[in-house]
Swiss-Prot record:
MF (Gene Ontology): ATP binding; tRNA dimethylallyltransferase activity
Protein name, per record: tRNA dimethylallyltransferase
InterPro entries: Dimethylallyltransferase, IPT, P-loop_NTPase
Residues that hold substrate according to the record: 13-18
Keyword tRNA processing: yes
UniProt family annotation: Belongs to the IPP transferase family.
Binding site for ATP: 11-18
Requisite cofactors: Mg(2+)
Job description of the protein: Catalyzes the transfer of a dimethylallyl group onto the adenine at position 37 in tRNAs that read codons beginning with uridine, leading to the formation of N6-(dimethylallyl)adenosine (i(6)A).
Known partners and oligomeric status: Monomer.
Marked site (Interaction with substrate tRNA) residue numbers: 102, 128
Keyword terms, alphabetized: ATP-binding, Magnesium, Nucleotide-binding, Transferase, tRNA processing
Amino acid sequence: MTKIKIVVIVGPTAVGKTALGISLAKAFNGEIISGDSQQVYRQLDIGTAKATQEEQEAAVHHLIDIREVTESYSAYDFVQDAQKAISDIVSRGKLPIIVGGTGLYLQSLLEGYHLGGQVDQEAVKAYRNELEQLDDHDLYERLQVNNITIEQVNRRRAIRALELAQFADELENAETAYEPLIIGLNDDRQVIYDRINQRVNRMLENGLLEEAKWLYEHYPTVQASRGIGYKELFPYFVGEMTLAEASDQLKQNTRRFAKRQLTWFRNRMAVSFTAITAPDYPQVVHDRVRDFLGQKEKS
């Protein structure tokens, strides 16, 4: 089977994945698929660092603004949506470029793991029932015991991750239809942390507070409201924190999130990282994509 070539850009938040994705889309006749669990939600633009209108006009983007904030979204949903988007992009002779930071989503798409026929389905059902009886605290303790880190934790995703860990020896690795080139972006920790702090400042200047307040007033308990960028500001709205304290909390949580992202990509995906401050960036990335596609450099 001839596999479909796709480019996947990963790295910590604020590292510049969107800008690189647009650059590659322009250079290699590509379209972008968002691999971010929060960018699927309509009306949540600033806190999710969604591509701006100008950026969306520079390159076609898929899987953003496809859910209402009241709806849930999972790795399973992402795989189904991403597969459809890839098929659509390829059918028009273009290159799919996945840009994202939600490691579980990307791994699910690229590796195609599922609990197949060799697994005792009654055992799976019994284990799932056991997990569903746990409260949130005990469930997340199970995650820690199994050394599982998942982003934007919710119960369904936690239970799924624990199932995969419990029956890892019996997993079937479904043959995927894709041949990915995984491009990792990173740099020195302080460079990334400075970019995160600057991004949070820009978000607040551009209206994040108003966006978060709208979410807090209308849908404070939905899955989308638990995303980094929103929940940190909720204490400010009820007088438990000053705006400066909430802003600092948001920066700190985002830095921790970036660290978890890097840990995930290093441990779970075959990726080599390129420093965004390197003198030959992004040319080195363009060269890698060109080689991957078997294209010659234009003279």
